[in-house]
Amino acid sequence: MVKEKLMEKNDWQQRTELLLGEEKMNRIRKANVLVVGLGGVGAYAAEMLCRTGVGKMTIVDADTVQPTNMNRQLPAMHSTLGMPKAEVLATRYKDINPDIELTVLPVYLKDENIPELLDAGKYDFIVDAIDTISPKCFLNYE
């Protein structure tokens, strides 16, 4: 009962709305964002978008959580070792913002699948947090 009362509709976003105003919050709630790469930069960027109240987000990363990620990456915990980063973070993001329309693509970005990915979403913004040069070049080329 207390939890429900605390989490009244959009109440958790009231501080952001005070800062930005109702019109800008409505634009954020309607925004569609693509985040490619969920490592040391992308996972944090996607989480902040989620916490801001973005309405729709697609997250893309084929990597799994490795022990070497523990010192810097949001999805890296002992309980998540070996799990797909995209799946780990999807669970986290939905827990933060249950209303977010989240698409999870645990795929490696290649020149062949970039047009399909970009055509699928009609994105308002794209976050390029890719740490490998070839997919970064493919994405920037498109």
PLM regions: where:
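Short amphipathic alpha-helix with an adjacent loop that forms part of the alpha/beta core around
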Residues: 112-123
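Glycine-rich adenosine-cofactor-binding loop
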Residues: 29-50, 56-61
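Rossmann-fold NAD(P)-binding glycine/threonine-rich loop
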Residues: 133-142
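N-terminal charged helix/coil linker that caps or initiates catalytic domains
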Residues: 1-33
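Hydrophobic residues within alpha-helices
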Residues: 45-46, 89, 139
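Glycine-rich phosphate-binding loop and adjoining beta1-alpha1-beta2 segment
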Residues: 54, 59-97
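Conserved acidic residues
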Residues: 106-108
